[in-house]
Amino acid sequence: MEEEDHATFAVGNPSHRFDRPLIRRSSDSISNLPDEILHHILSFIPETNLVIRTSVLSKRWRHVWSKTPHLSFEWLMVSPKLINKTLASYTASKITSFHLCTSYSYEAGHVHSSIEFAMSHNVDNLSLAFSSFPPCNKFPDFFYTSSSLKRVELRSASLTPSCIVSWTSLRDLSLTRCNLSDKSFLKILSGCPILESLSLKFCESLKYLDLSKSLRLTRLEIERRSCFREPMQSMQIVAPHIHYLRLRDSEAHCTFLV
């Protein structure tokens, strides 16, 4: 009789026996996914400090963020102290992408330690954006040596390598408002043997680009414009291997030798 009453109750009140477990299973369906898929989901969240907030969702989520291969920090929104604490809690051995936006002159020591952390974790894609203008930073020597970097994007940086550059896996280099001499740029190119794509935006200090030894470099994008309405010097470019060329808003004469 007890079983019949129980069965009757189950049929007469399905919400008590069926709906609630279904809701529970639905809420756990994402949490039950493998870490790799959860990391992919977290990669769509733009900033790491927001990713960390998912750790309060449940015990399952508590440490998921600490192995996400994508790290992104905006130091205008997050303090360097908090970033250091975040990196100290990071447990993955490999970083796919690392983005940092900050004022270099104010936090140079923190910037160097963050870059070193990313490179020690064999980062593939490195993006650094500095708010100081004109560029005033000086990267340490270890910055110019990496066998893992595949893409480097720098904004408002000063590139003056005093050591041999060795970016042996780099395929894509993007520089915006960066300060570097023709000699420094040639030194960087010599350390990128498989470079395929190069973007130079508002790097007005460059006057001569010799890309003849970059045999795999087939894509070139250049954008030049004077910010202070001062006349710019012409640029001479030697690029015999380029298949795709894009010039944008160029106010200065460019001479191509192919």
From Swiss-Prot:
Enumerate the spans annotated as F-box domain.
27-76
Q: Name the source's superkingdom.
A: Eukaryota
Under the heading Gene3D superfamilies, the entry gives: 1.20.1280.50, Ribonuclease Inhibitor (3.80.10.10)
Q: What is one Pfam family matched by this protein? A: F-box
InterPro entries documented for this protein: F-box-like_dom_sf (IPR036047), F-box_AtFBL13-like (IPR053781), F-box_dom (IPR001810), F-box_plant (IPR044997), LRR_dom_sf (IPR032675), LRR_FXL15/At3g58940/PEG3-like (IPR055411)
Keyword tags = Leucine-rich repeat, Repeat
Start-end of each LRR repeat: 101-130, 136-161, 177-202, 224-249
Q: What is this protein called?
A: F-box/LRR-repeat protein 25
